[in-house]
């Protein structure tokens, strides 16, 4: 089966939430989108609240990924523990609330793995290596049983995003980068 995936990032502020609420379901239907991953870490400009996460689900997001603004709205911590459809970067160092990857049911019984990782270049966060963390997750039996594995790599530098894409080539079905809120000027 051909799986049509839509990756949306980063949803910024009320304007981003509003356009998603008005257009995402229509787009999913028009383009026969089966699974949608939305980076929602800027839904409240910096960070996301549980109410905003629920709004993204209502708009049509299947999974929400986060990034360097994960902890800007402290009320999200409990939500991250309870809701398996919202992911924070898997490579945050130490014990932090939530999960960095998930396995979800797709159409026709497909198992879809989604991994959320964050780059370390020019991002001020306490992070383990995203490359080592990717390896650890991809060695897990439950992830290996997935039909499709998708990776949202939240990073500043296009060089780091490109390195991750090459590193995961042949091991996952898709890698995309989120975070930079403007188009790149380096031909990427």
Language-model regions: role of each:
Residues 1-188:
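Acidic, metal/ion-coordinating pockets
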């Amino acid at each position: 089966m051909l799986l049509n995936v839509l990756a949306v990032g980063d949803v910024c502020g009320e304007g981003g939430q509003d356009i998603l609420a008005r257009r995402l379901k229509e787009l999913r239907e028009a383009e026969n989108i089966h699974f949608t991953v939305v980076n929602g870490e800027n839904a409240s400009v910096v960070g996301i609240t549980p109410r905003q996460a629920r709004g993204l689900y209502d708009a049509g997001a299947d999974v929400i990924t986060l990034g360097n603004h994960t902890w800007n709205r402290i009320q999200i911590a409990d939500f991250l523990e309870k809701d398996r459809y919202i992911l924070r970067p898997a490579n945050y160092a130490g014990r932090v609330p939530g999960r960095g990857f998930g396995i979800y049911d797709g159409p026709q019984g497909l198992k879809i793995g989604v991994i959320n990782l964050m780059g370390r270049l020019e991002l001020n966060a306490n992070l383990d290596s995203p490359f080592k963390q990717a390896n650890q997750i991809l060695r897990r039996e439950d992830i290996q049983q997935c039909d499709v594995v998708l990776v949202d790599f939240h990073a500043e530098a296009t060089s780091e995003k490109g390195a991750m894409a090459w590193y995961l080539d042949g091991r996952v079905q898709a890698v995309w980068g989120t975070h930079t809120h403007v188009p790149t000027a380096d031909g990427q």
